Curated annotation (Swiss-Prot):
Lineage per the UniProt record: Viruses, Duplodnaviria, Heunggongvirae, Uroviricota, Caudoviricetes
UniProt protein name: Gene 22 protein
The encoding gene: 22
Length: 139
């Protein structure tokens, strides 16, 4: 196993634990139709690099964050924006997870409406480069 955590193992717990997203399904792989629940946010890594000066301490992955809602386009946009604010706050507050924490955030493509892959739902998606660091040591 590599020294760096998967970005999803840092981002998903942050989103799941925030009360602003209570009732929202946070996934890193969209479940089969029989198990899919809306509203839903899917986090998927689509690229990024490690810090050349500290490759075992800091990476800069790019994630695709997709918000899905069956309530309407406006509600879907608001869901995306709320999740994005949760990530900005996690960077600002240095929110720790067992896997690590987020040290920076940069929107490479802001919130964009796409056709949803799932019947009777809307999708808002953006690309976000996150600074991911290993957990802080207390020793």
């Amino acid at each position: 196993m590599g020294a760096m955590p998967r970005v999803q193992s840092v981002v998903a717990p942050i989103l799941r634990e925030d009360p602003r997203l209570a009732g929202v399904t946070i996934v890193t792989w969209v479940p089969d139709i029989d198990f899919r629940e809306f509203p839903m946010i899917n986090i998927r890594r689509i690229g990024g690099i490690r810090n050349a000066n500290a490759p075992k301490l800091h990476s800069l992955p790019v994630v695709e964050m997709s918000a899905y809602s069956t309530d309407g386009l406006i509600e879907c946009e608001e869901l995306y924006e709320t999740a994005l604010e949760v990530l900005y706050d996690a960077v600002k507050n240095g929110t720790q997870t067992p896997a690590g924490y987020l040290s920076s955030i940069f929107e490479t493509m802001g919130a964009t409406q796409f056709s949803s892959l799932y019947q009777d739902s809307w999708r808002i998606q953006g690309l976000i480069r996150l600074g991911v660091r290993t957990p802080r040591s207390t020793t």
